[in-house]
Amino acid sequence: MARLRPERLRAALDEQLIALGRADEAPPPDARLEDALVAAVLAAYDAGEEPVRTALRVTARVLLERLATDFPGRSVEVRVPPYAAVQCVEGPRHTRGTPPNVIETDAKTWIMLATGRTTWDEARDRISASGERADLSARLPVRPYGAQP
């Protein structure tokens, strides 16, 4: 998965801040855009609102990228349809077809898991997981919210 360009991150952040009525906030430097976007999406959820679609998509992708960066490998595929999927976690890798370890969940559940707002056990009924390695509880939340490689 290619790294998101700052322009895409900034556009998603701006759109979410406008939806939150915080359009006049000073934009963060490029190095902080990802964290600012995650915070804006969480603020929407905290306010009882749905994040704007672009911000939701980009945030899900940012958090999946962090998981894959911190726990590289190809033994587990994590899917957040329709937004993104990554392969991560060292171990036996697959080369064709569906991987033996697949985790799939919706974007809100993924964001809440990745940021430590909910635990794997609390979200179990909203996660489809198959395979002996399809449990990310020891790897969540992602940095800077918790788990470190």
Where are these regions (language model features)?
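C-terminal interaction segments
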Residues: 1-37, 98-149
